[in-house]
Amino acid sequence: MTLRKSLLILCLVIWSSNFVFGQELNATVTIQSNKVDNQVDPKVFIQLQSQLKDFLNQRKWSNDIYGNEEKIECSFYITIESVLSPNVYNAKLSVVSNRPVYNSNYTTPVLNMQDANFTFKYQLSQPVEFNENKVQGTDPLEANLTATLAYYIYIILGLDYDSYELRGGAAYFNKALNVVYNAPEASGINGWKSYDGQRNRFILIDNLTKSGMDKIHEVIYSYYREGLDQMSTNFETSRGTILNALMTMQEVQDANTNTMVVPILLQGKYAEISGIFGNADKAMKKQLIATLSVIDIANLNKYKEKLE
């Protein structure tokens, strides 16, 4: 039995009279279409936004029971870049998920992903459906809409479960891998193949499932469950645990120089990490900076300004 499921059963026992159970996500969907407003009826994207919100929040994505207070907070931001042909759009997708930290009012970012290869077909009254046994559907461009979203939902679930139980997200990463292996194929559809750029869906799920990068799951569990979740009871020990997790992340980076998952896991973490280590001793800060100089070069100068 997973930790998440155990917690939910406890909640059921204590609050059964007031607790309402439902699906896994509390997702928001925002579609920005100003670049094509003079080409497309605004009703199209208003309806699509509503349908996608229902698709994400009303479908069951796992076998576990979630209470309202256990739902995963996440957001999907779609920017329509251009109209490729009638009802076919090129877009950028931003996916963000968060997780509460135990015994606090703090919410920590888990996934912060930008996907620039989001092409799909949609027209008014089109059903928004996904069948994991027939990912390609009957029209690849229509299917790519929900296949891409389903893929990221499984990534969100996998990371969330990993953060509560060591390697707890394996089943969901395998579901994401199944989407990749059976992804829609058509002209204009990109992001599913290993050669579709340096950052794509194939590479991300490959990083999360191949044996050579298994330590990344130890990092996720250690950082969140053994680190952040324990800070209210033993701050110093938890801070050391988080530093060790980041050092293990460096080991993963050193062994897999082109990894995609390390920078994604660190995306949006600057404020959190610098806050945790702001009053650490000089030796700990020195070790942290040395580690970040390998795994988060993009933000290294900001860390140095804050911590040195």
Set out the residue ranges of the language-model regions.
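Flexible, glycine-rich surface segments
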Residues: L157, Y164-N258
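Sec-exported extracytoplasmic/periplasmic mature domains
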Residues: K53-W61, Y154, G158-D162, S274, ...
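Second-shell loop/turn segments in exported
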Residues: K35-P42, V135-A143, D254-A255
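Acidic/His-rich structured neighborhood in mature extracellular/periplasmic domains
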Residues: N87-I203
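A cross-kingdom marker for long, charged
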Residues: T30, M213, H217-E308
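Start-of-domain marker
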Residues: Q23-N90, V101-N103
